[in-house]
């Protein structure tokens, strides 16, 4: 099997297997050599990032956004090393909130990809990654949705559900006192009944 020759890096690969080729193509040196090759090619044609879209026209503008190699030459976009960047999965072509796809947009002074007009927000607010709730509405404690909505937004204050052991113990002591009072009242009523019965005899 013949060795694989990389035209961008001008080398023969020692490992010519598909896995070796893939590893080479994803390597840093190969990517930088590929970028340098296309930059030299564009420079020879007299194409710069500033006039790049003017050479291509409307169709070329859309193709340039779809082609990652061409997208790297546009100002404001990340280069090919963005695979080492933690924000590599972020869609960079829509960074500008005023960005629009329209015919004839290459004639607009704000049409360059990644260009931010003065006074606009370069990075729009991202509500999904904020720790705040969007509408800042507090949840009720115990929302009981009924026509007679008497329980809405009232905090729970039942002492028997508190985790405080002292309160629980006090409640039990109160219950014991109540039980003993009931018992003594029962005894007194029983004795009074016996006393009445003895007098009747």
Curated annotation (Swiss-Prot):
Keyword Metal-binding: yes
Any one biological process term the GO annotation gives: spliceosomal snRNP assembly
PROSITE patterns tied to this protein: ZF_MATRIN
Superkingdom of origin: Eukaryota
A molecular-function term among this protein's GO annotations: U1 snRNA binding
Composition bias, Low complexity: 137-154
Keywords per UniProt: Metal-binding, Nucleus, Ribonucleoprotein, RNA-binding, Zinc, Zinc-finger
ZnF Matrin-type span: 4-36
Alphabetical list of Pfam families matching this protein: zf-U1
Annotated Gene3D superfamilies: Classic Zinc Finger (3.30.160.60)
Subcellular location: Nucleus
Principal place of residence: nucleus
HAMAP family, per the entry: U1_C
PANTHER family membership: U1 SMALL NUCLEAR RIBONUCLEOPROTEIN C (PTHR31148:SF1)
Described function: Component of the spliceosomal U1 snRNP, which is essential for recognition of the pre-mRNA 5' splice-site and the subsequent assembly of the spliceosome. U1-C is directly involved in initial 5' splice-site recognition for both constitutive and regulated alternative splicing. The interaction with the 5' splice-site seems to precede base-pairing between the pre-mRNA and the U1 snRNA. Stimulates commitment or early (E) complex formation by stabilizing the base pairing of the 5' end of the U1 snRNA and the 5' splice-site region.
Protein name: U1 small nuclear ribonucleoprotein C
Biological source species: Plasmodium yoelii yoelii
